Structure formats: structure tokens, C-alpha cells
Design a protein with these regions (language model features):
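Extended hydrophobic/aromatic-rich secondary-structure runs
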Residues: 1-2, 132
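Conserved NTP/Mg2+-binding pocket subregion across the NTase superfamily
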Residues: 3-117
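Conserved nucleotidyltransferase catalytic core and NTase-mimicking acidic/glycine-rich helix/loop elements
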Residues: 73-214
Length: 214
């Protein structure tokens, strides 16, 4: 039985959540249409289309899923298709799509953060910092040929799994998060250091030229 339930939730796609009364475990179920999930995977692994942050999350979901019931074998077939090497074209496209929005184009996130700091707009600083980090991690995981695990424990996942990490990765990330919480001008310096170290790594790996780093 459930001690509390929230059913037929429409907010982040159809889903149900409840607390399992005997254990207190929170059960979280999200429903995906089979055709929709297929389209997401083919868009990624066949067509190699990048997104702005979180590009390979559904691929990661598929790869790490445990099949409990699959009477037609549909999910197993899709999972077998997904168990492939990281496509190099996809890797390059994720980086080339997400890297410029960090600070390489006029409306880049770093520039939006600078303007928000000047306005004293703490909500906007928080919002734009989150967007910057979404693309930052998309670039980092693509560089390492890792599927993106989603929004939780990203730093821990990177530290455990990324063979290639920017210099001062953990310190830079913590500095950005701490400074952005107060919308201090220090956030601009922290973002610059974070992105400088990412660009140094990308340049060393031959992924971008020096002229692309700013």
C-alpha cells in the first residue's frame, strides 16, 4: 500500500508517484510513448542531432534500464540498438553546438550572466548559470564519449567517470555555484576560470582551435 500518492501527474510528462508504506521508499513512474522514445533514440544515434544541454540523457536512460516486462521484445530491440559505440559525428556536433553558447556568441550564457550581475538580478544569474552548466556538462560528457546521466549528481558522475577533466574542475565548479548564489561580481571571474580550463582541455585534445575559445 501507499502512505501517500500523487497520481496522473501532468507536469513533466505523464507520471505517478507514491510512498511505499512498509518501506517509505518513494516510487516515481514516468510514462513514455514507445514511438516517442524510438524517435528520440533514432534522432540521436542515427541522425546525430544535438540539443542545447542534456543531449544524450534518453540514451543513458535506455542503456541503464532493467527490463521487467517486454512481451513484444520492443524495448529489448531498441536497447540492443542503443548499445553501440559513441558516434563520432554526434560527439563533434554536441561540442560544436553547445560550446559557442558558453561565451562565443553575443547572447552566450557568460554574457547574460554579466548583464544579470550588473542589474543585480539574482534570479536571472541563477537561471543563466544553470543553463551554462547544462551546456558545459554536455560538452564535457561528449568529449569523454559518455552518455549524459541527467540533472542529478553531475559533478560526482564526472569525477568518477571522465578520463578527461578540466584543470581545477571541482574547485572551479564550486566557485561558480557559490558566487552565483549571491549574484556577486565574483561569479564573472569564476565563470571565466571554469570556461578557460574547459577550453584548455578542448584545445589540448584537438577539439577546438585557440581562436574558438573566446
Amino acid at each position: 500500500g501507499a502512505s501517500r500518492a500523487s497520481l496522473d501527474l501532468p507536469y513533466w510528462g505523464p507520471g505517478d508517484e507514491w510512498y511505499h508504506a512498509p518501506t517509505g521508499i518513494e516510487v516515481d513512474i514516468v510514462y513514455f510513448e514507445a514511438e516517442w522514445m524510438e524517435a528520440q533514440i533514432y534522432r540521436l544515434l542515427r541522425d546525430h542531432q544535438p540539443s542545447l544541454g542534456y543531449t544524450t540523457c534518453f540514451w543513458h536512460t535506455l542503456l541503464t534500464s532493467i527490463v521487467l516486462h517486454d512481451p513484444r521484445g520492443w524495448f529489448t530491440r531498441l536497447q540492443d540498438f542503443a548499445r553501440q559505440d559513441y558516434p563520432e559525428t554526434l560527439r563533434q556536433r554536441i561540442i560544436s553546438f553547445n560550446h559557442p553558447v558558453l561565451r562565443g556568441v553575443i547572447p552566450a550564457y557568460a554574457h547574460q550572466i554579466e548583464k544579470a550581475v550588473r542589474r543585480g538580478d539574482r534570479v536571472s544569474v541563477n537561471h543563466r548559470t544553470a543553463a551554462l552548466l547544462a551546456s558545459y556538462f554536455d560538452v564535457l560528457f561528449a568529449l569523454n564519449r559518455l552518455s549524459h546521466p541527467g540533472e542529478k549528481r553531475l559533478a560526482d558522475f564526472a569525477l568518477r567517470n571522465c578520463k578527461l577533466l578540466p584543470d581545477q574542475f571541482e574547485a572551479d565548479l564550486n566557485a561558480v555555484l557559490l558566487a552565483s548564489a549571491s549574484a556577486s561580481p565574483d561569479v564573472n571571474l569564476a565563470v571565466t576560470r571554469l570556461l578557460d580550463h574547459l577550453d584548455e582541455l578542448l584545445e589540448n585534445e584537438g577539439v577546438i582551435a585557440n581562436s574558438e575559445s573566446l
